[in-house]
Design a protein with these regions (language model features):
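Extracellular ligand-binding/catalytic regions of CAZymes and related secreted enzymes
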Residues: 2-60, 160-171, 280, 350-354, ...
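Juxtamembrane extramembrane loops of integral membrane proteins
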Residues: 7-232, 236
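Acidic carboxylate-rich catalytic motifs and surrounding loops in phosphoryl-/glycosyl-chemistry enzymes
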Residues: 99-103, 207, 284-288, 475-476
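Short linear loop/turn motifs
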Residues: 120-125, 129, 284-294, 478
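Extended, charge-rich low-complexity interaction segments
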Residues: 120-143, 311-329, 501-504
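A cross-taxonomic marker for long C-terminal extensions/tails that follow the last structured domain
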Residues: 133, 142, 149, 334-343, ...
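Conserved GHKL (Bergerat-fold) ATPase module
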Residues: 154, 184-187, 265, 531, ...
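Acidic, S/T/G-rich, low-cysteine, solvent-exposed domains in lumenal/extracellular/periplasmic regions
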Residues: 168, 185-470
């Protein structure tokens, strides 16, 4: 190769390397990001981009992160990127600091952040290290703390919620009222309570049959089997004062301590009150072909106990196709599993606006009598299927002015207890209600059935109830049902299983064999032609 060509090659190589270096430097200063996720999980929401308009004075966000953790985990880098992007669109209203508190943890600890233990390996030696990772949002003399942050999954929701809480200097209070005798907040609703606390709400236990304070922003009524008219009167009084409520109720009570024996819920309790608001819950059970597989402990034939997995149509997996695409609660539907739901119908009252949130599939059916819910009752599950197959409503919302259920007639009484307050008006101010016809879907059973998106549904409903609609889309896009159970129809599932066997065990091996035979035939033909050519040349 001539000297001029070699010189040109060297020059071209040097210029190429220089261009790569300059491109790398430029990418640290100017960059863009393409979000290919279906839920736009890595794109700032409209609520976050417009947050500057809600901030009167500058907000300071401090991310306390130990360098030892940042060097070993990808989460902190993603968190810092998110905070910097939020700072960039805030028009100077948000200032972000990144602080390593390892040497001087006093500032972090003054905000309530505590060190977390992490196993690290250095020079072939394993040890426990104390690391910090948490975010503090400061506004004037107030602050909100987000502890133990290690991913961006729900960070945008938590940051926006914390900023708004700092500005307003108040966390919304969510009252939790357990309405079943066998359940309590401490033993059965910790997943929900913890989720509410993490989402920026202050959970507060409400005892049945007591007045609900004015500072409660929304009320969860969790179950209704142990609530009578006296208890319902206090809930009605809360709504008549403009309170918002989420009702998780049932028409049939299931006793898990007695072989899942099912009995209708007393009609004189909460259900008549809901009926006066336009929600009729039948004393029946809805079963659906879209359901969960549930492990039951049953008696083994040879004695002792065994775990039996049962396709359990009483635990209904709601299909996204049968949810409202317009209501913010379900517009970004992540999943919802209902345990022993009852059918619901709507009977509009006054000027109240109702919206159907979720329905079963079109192949659901009912148990209207002779309830059979135990694993030993499988042959009885579908006795009424032929006569009751159809689609049934299981969740709905309503907003408007509701008539008081106690405006007419004498107020209920209870011996030894003070009388409930009489309605101050015959109808409520403008308010909102959510009703789901399953009382148990928000219990801690959701963790056992891998249905923790139930809690996300309840939190989205809370945001809708307190009119924080723009936060719902942020929360919902971080929660996805990842279970491989999309095919609900039993016949379709069976057909696809057979088709999979045919393809993997039949067609694929035959294709490989056919390809091999074809290659062998081509090779033999080429060898024959080659021998013919060599013979002719000879």
């Amino acid at each position: 190769m001539s000297a001029p060509l070699k010189k040109q090659e060297r020059t071209l190589m040097i210029l190429t390397l220089l261009a790569i270096v300059l491109l790398g430097v430029a990418s640290t200063m100017y960059f863009t990001r393409i979000d290919l996720t279906s839920s736009r999980a890595f794109t700032l929401s409209k609520a976050a981009r417009g947050l500057y308009a809600e901030i009167p004075e500058r907000i300071r966000i401090t991310y306390f992160i130990s360098k030892s953790l940042a060097d070993r985990h990808p989460g902190p880098a993603a968190i810092e990127d998110f905070l910097r992007e939020l700072e960039a669109v805030s028009r100077g209203k948000i200032q972000v600091r990144i602080v390593d508190p390892t040497k001087n943890p006093a500032e972090a600890e003054s905000f309530g952040l505590v060190a977390q233990q992490m196993q690290v390996v250095e020079q072939s030696e394993q040890r426990l290290a104390l690391v910090y990772t948490g975010i503090v949002v400061e506004y004037l003399d107030r602050h909100q703390t987000i502890p133990a942050v290690l991913s961006t999954d729900t960070l945008e929701y938590e940051i926006v919620k914390a900023i708004r809480a700092s500005i307003r200097d108040k966390k919304p209070i969510a009252g939790l009222l357990a309405g079943d005798a066998d359940k309590s907040l401490a033993n059965d609703y910790q997943t929900l309570a913890n989720g509410l606390a993490q989402a920026g709400y202050e959970p507060r236990e409400i005892r049945a049959g007591t007045a609900i304070d004015d500072d409660v922003d929304l009320l969860y009524v969790l179950g209704n089997a142990n609530l009578d008219r006296y208890d319902a009167a206090f809930i009605d009084d809360f709504l008549m004062r403009g309170g918002k409520a989420f009702f998780a109720v049932k028409g049939v009570n299931i006793d898990p301590t007695n072989g899942l024996v099912a009995t209708p819920v007393q009609e004189a309790g909460l259900l008549p009150m809901l009926a006066s608001y336009g929600f009729n819950i039948a004393s029946q059970l809805v079963l659906d072909q879209s359901n969960l597989t549930v492990p039951f402990q049953t008696q083994a034939p040879q004695g002792g106990y065994q775990i039996q997995y049962v396709r359990y149509p009483h635990w209904v997996a709601i299909d996204a196709r049968y949810t409202s695409a317009t209501n913010p609660i379900t517009a970004h539907f992540a999943g919802l599993d209902l345990y022993w739901p009852s059918p619901m119908t709507l009977r509009p009252v006054g000027t109240v606006h109702y919206e159907e949130l979720a329905k079963t599939t079109t192949k659901a059916w009912l148990q209207t009598k002779n309830f059979a819910a135990g694993p030993q009752d499988q042959p009885l599950y579908a006795l009424e299927r032929d006569t009751t197959t159809g689609q049934y409503l299981v969740a709905a919302t309503a907003q408007g002015s509701f008539p008081s259920a106690f405006a007419v007639g004498a107020m209920p009484t209870r011996a030894g207890s003070p009388p409930p307050p009489a309605p101050k008006a015959t109808s409520s101010p403008e308010t909102r209600i959510v009703v789901v016809s399953s009382a148990d879907f928000l219990t801690d059973m959701m963790s056992m059935s891998d249905s923790t998106f139930n809690a996300s549904f309840a939190l989205s409903a809370a945001d809708w109830l307190v009119s924080a609609d723009d936060l719902i889309a942020i929360r919902s896009r971080a929660v996805v049902d990842t279970r491989l159970n999309r095919i609900k129809d039993a016949d379709t599932r069976a057909f696809l299983v057979v088709l999979t066997y045919i393809v993997t065990l039949g067609l694929v091996p035959l294709a490989v064999i056919g390809y091999g035979l074809l290659r062998a035939r081509k090779r033999a033909r080429k060898e024959k032609e080659s021998r013919t050519i060599r013979g002719g040349e000879a």
